[in-house]
Design a protein with these regions (language model features):
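Short, low-complexity, Pro/Ser/Thr/Gly-rich segments in the mature regions of secreted, periplasmic
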Residues: 89-90, 197-213
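Generic marker of residues within folded, mature protein domains
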Residues: 7, 18, 37, 124-126, ...
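Structural motif
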Residues: 29-40
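Short, low-hydrophobicity acidic/polar segments
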Residues: 1-24
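Tryptophan-paired
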Residues: 40-162
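Beta-strand secondary-structure signal
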Residues: 14-16, 25-29, 46, 133-135
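C-terminal structured domain segments
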Residues: 133-200
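Short, structured patches in soluble enzyme cores that scaffold and shape functional sites
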Residues: 21, 30-32, 51
Length: 213
């Protein structure tokens, strides 16, 4: 891809430059198993993205120090908007779902990198740590009801595009994600059913150990 233009004198110069959007946005929609579920308000849940971040160069790659080492630093992204959506007329929809009520959280993050499947990139104390995890906690009990690697399961949607893209290319091309979760009551065993919707594609992670990937 062309990365520069040579401008000489007063003559017009044209060309095509490759651009990359290095920010991502996420809409987290949480639905109750039961519409009369007690305590289903935004203030009772902590939703955040925990991961690493680094300075990026003009190509979107991580800047390395004099020794060629990436300087990843821990970072936490919190919602810039959160609200309870209540059905008052019988026709409320959130991301296409007909519901009585839902919690909606909007977040953003920096560029997401494909997660390598090795110990160093999964160790949060390592400078090579390179992950972003969506973590949902019930504040009433302090229990994490969802903790999973975003690059890992969002890249699964890329496999369904039939574009032949590698995981990193898909993560770069897609800049907005909608994740829909069905949240159990605190008295349950905290097996959460998660339906992740990305541009019409649906992934189901059901009754699994969602904190291990």
């Amino acid at each position: 891809a062309q990365t520069s233009l040579d401008f000489k004198g007063k003559k017009d110069t044209s060309g095509k430059l490759s651009l990359m959007k290095c920010t991502k946005t996420y809409r987290i929609v949480m639905l109750p198993y039961d519409n009369d579920q007690q305590g289903f308000v935004a203030e009772n849940f902590d939703v955040r993205i925990k991961g690493s971040a680094a300075l990026l160069d003009y190509k979107g790659d991580k800047v390395k120090d004099a020794n060629g080492v990436e300087q990843n630093k821990p970072i936490t992204y919190v919602p810039y908007n959160e609200k309870l959506v209540v059905n008052t007329d019988g026709n409320t929809e959130v991301e296409g779902e007909i519901i009585d009520k839902a919690l909606v959280y909007d977040l953003s993050s920096s560029r997401m990198f494909e997660r390598k499947n090795d110990v160093s990139t999964r160790n949060t104390d390592s400078k090579e740590y390179n992950d972003k995890r969506i973590v949902i906690t019930d504040k009433r009990t302090g229990k994490e009801i969802f903790n999973h690697s975003l690059p890992w399961f969002l890249a699964l949607c890329g496999e369904r595009t039939d574009k032949g893209w590698e995981d990193q290319e898909y993560l770069d091309r897609q800049d907005h994600y909608t994740l829909v979760f069905y949240v159990p009551s605190p008295g349950s065993d905290y097996h959460m059913d998660a339906r992740i919707k990305v541009n019409g594609w649906v992934l189901n992670l059901q009754n699994a150990d969602l904190g291990s990937k």
